[in-house]
Each structure stands twice: as C-alpha cells, then as structure tokens.
Regions:
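Generic recognition of stable, solvent-exposed alpha-helical segments in well-folded globular domains
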Residues: 8-15, 37, 162, 181, ...
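A short, mixed-charge helix-start or loop-turn motif at secondary-structure junctions
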Residues: 197, 251, 323-325
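Mobile active-site "lid"/loop adjacent to the S-adenosyl-L-methionine
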Residues: 306-337, 341
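Conserved S-adenosyl-L-methionine
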Residues: 201-302, 307-309, 336
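Non-catalytic, mostly N-terminal accessory regions of nucleic-acid modification and defense proteins
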Residues: 1-214, 218-219, 280-286, 291
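Short, surface-exposed linear patches
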Residues: 54-56, 276-277, 303-304, 322-324
Length: 341
C-alpha cells in the first residue's frame, strides 16, 4: 500500500476521533474511538470469512441466518460458526454486525441498546473456547450510558451514530491482502496521537516508535528468528509487536497492570493479525503476581514507567538508561521479570 493511501486512512480515522472529542479527556475519547474501530474490523473480518466459506452454497452469511430453520440450515450454520471460532476465535451473528448497526442508524433507530448487545455477544461467543482469555471483557471500557457522550439518551445516540456513520465511509481494506498493514499501522498511529494528547501519562500505555525500533533491533542481533518475546509491562503492546515483527517471533507474551491498557494491548494484537492462539496478554502487576512464572523466553523487552524520587519516568526519560537498564535475554533458562529502577 502506498504511503499516500496509508496517510489517508490515518487522517480519516483521526477525523472520526475528533467527532467524539468534545469535552472528553484524551484517554476517554481514545477508548471509545479505538473500540468502535475494532468492532468494525471484527465485523468485516468475520463477514468476509463466512461469505468465503459459503461460496459453494451460493448464499451469503446474512442470507443463511435469515433462512427458515430446518436441519440442513441449522447444520450449515453450525459449520460456519465452528469455522469462525477455530480460525478467528469469535463469532458475531449477522444481526449484530457493524453493517447491521449502520442499517438501523439509517432507519433513525436508537442503536445504543443493540450496539451494547453486539459488543457483549462478541465476548460471550468465546466462552469455553480457546480464545476466551483473549476476548473476555475486551469492550468493558465502552460505557454507552456515560454522560460524557451527551446529556440525554438522544444526545448519546446521535453522537455515537454519527461516529459509526463516519467509520462506515472508511475502507478498512479487509478484502485486500494488505489488511493487516493497513489497519495495524493506522491503529498504532491513533494510539500515538492519543499518547501525544495524554502528556506525561502517555508512557503508561505507549512506547514511541523510535524507542520500540531501537529495542527491537537490539533484541534480534545475531538471531534470524526468535521463538518468543515477552514484555512484563507491555502497555498497549506497541513495543511487543515491533520486537515480534523484527525478530519473526512465533509467540508473544505480555503483562499489563492497568485493565484499560490491557484491553488496548489485546485489541492491538488482533488488529495486527496476530492469531489468538499466538499471543497471551495477562492483566496484573508483574511485581506482585508474575503470570508467567518459570516460562522461558528468547527475549525480554521493557519500557517501564515508574516513580523515582517523586518523578514519573516516561519513555523519554528511559531513553537515557536503555543500554544499562533494559536487559535483553536470549534465554536457555527460566528468567526473572526485569524492571527499570
């Protein structure tokens, strides 16, 4: 994809984000915007997968779910649902797709109850599945009853509807082979823009690309391929993704203390095309409860943010101590979590 098209998508998504901004803080409108983008991506991805699976049956995903029920229809629905769960880890019935929400908006309907159910259905579809931990509570930060969206129910519905309509006009490129590059890049750009607006708090969830690139290149020195990579304070996962990409790592592991940032990290993994079975992000304080114990890792990267003498160490401060305090392990033995001090 050309840089021109890449920049166009970035600009379009940032314009959508600013429709939500209003009186919200950078972090508040970040969670709503990124959550809605992610919902559209999941909807388009599953619709494409299901339609491709039904080509020989000469029906579409939506048509199959509106057909009169009989044994054959139910069996085919079961086959499609199973294929989706095995391949992408979740399932969305056609009536809860992003495109169905758009149809309701165009009919001037109140879409908030339906949207809330749609997000919940995505999470619930993974219960008992191998992907349950990757999707559980993923949309918990999207509070559609929040007064930040408007004073009245109508105000909230109007604002959210306008944002979703604006997203509907943007081509995410899910039909194209470059979908991962397109959305992954745009999502990272959005997070970086929100980080810029968050000021000193940015270091809690985002590592600038320059820092990520340096760490990722160091961690791959002398290694054509890493088996796995780990970040004990992974934030939104940008550093992990960069290290995994440059090191061609098969598996990604991370832990994040902040529940909201933990959700961003999982979304970031999925939007970059990392299969649910190839990453494991845990929510918790690594110092108090290390989720990975004696797990062996080929490499560890970290951009830790902490208080030192009352001063918050952000990623920019950390740049001065990277060589001394980021320890990169190509492990043949169990490792202990590593931190900046």
């Amino acid at each position: 994809m050309s840089e021109e098209l890449q920049q166009k998508l970035r600009d379009q998504l940032w314009e959508v984000a600013n429709k939500l901004r209003g009186n919200m803080s950078a972090s508040d409108f970040m969670y709503f915007t990124l959550g809605f983008i992610f919902y559209k991506y999941l909807s388009e991805k599953i619709e494409k997968l299901a339609n491709d699976a039904l080509v020989d049956d000469e029906i579409t995903f939506k048509e199959l779910w509106t057909m009169e029920k009989d044994d054959d229809v139910e069996e085919l629905q079961k086959v499609v649902k199973t294929e989706c769960l095995e391949n992408i880890g979740y399932f969305i019935e056609p009536s809860f797709l992003f495109s169905s929400i758009i149809e309701s908006i165009k009919k001037k309907e109140n879409i908030l109850p339906m949207l809330e159910r749609s997000l919940k259905r995505i999470e619930d579809s993974t219960l008992g599945q191998a992907s349950e931990e990757d999707f559980g509570g993923l949309f918990s930060d999207i509070d559609l009853a929040s007064p930040k969206l408007g004073k009245s129910a109508d105000d909230k519905n109007t604002l959210v509807s306008n944002v979703l309509l604006a997203l509907d006009d943007i081509d995410f490129g899910v039909e194209a082979s470059q979908e991962i590059d397109i959305l992954g890049d745009a999502y990272e750009y959005m997070i970086s823009q929100f980080a810029a607006g968050a000021g000193k708090k940015a270091g809690e969830f985002y590592t600038p690309q320059e820092v990520s690139r340096i760490l990722a290149e160091i961690v791959t020195i002398g290694h054509a391929r890493l088996r796995n990579v780990y970040d004990p304070t992974c934030g939104s996962g940008s550093l992990l993704l960069r290290a995994a990409s440059i090191g061609h790592a098969n598996e990604i592991f991370g832990q994040e203390k902040n529940p909201t940032t933990y959700n961003l990290a999982r979304m970031n993994m999925l939007l970059h095309g990392i299969k649910f079975s190839n990453f494991r992000i845990e929510n918790g304080d690594t110092l108090e409860a290390d989720a990975f114990g004696d797990t062996q890792f080929d490499a560890v990267v970290a951009n830790h943010h902490s208080q030192q003498n009352g001063v918050l160490l952000t990623s920019l401060t950390v740049m001065t101590v990277l060589v001394k305090q980021v320890v990169l392990l190509h492990a043949r033995q169990p490792i202990m979590p590593l931190y900046f001090t």
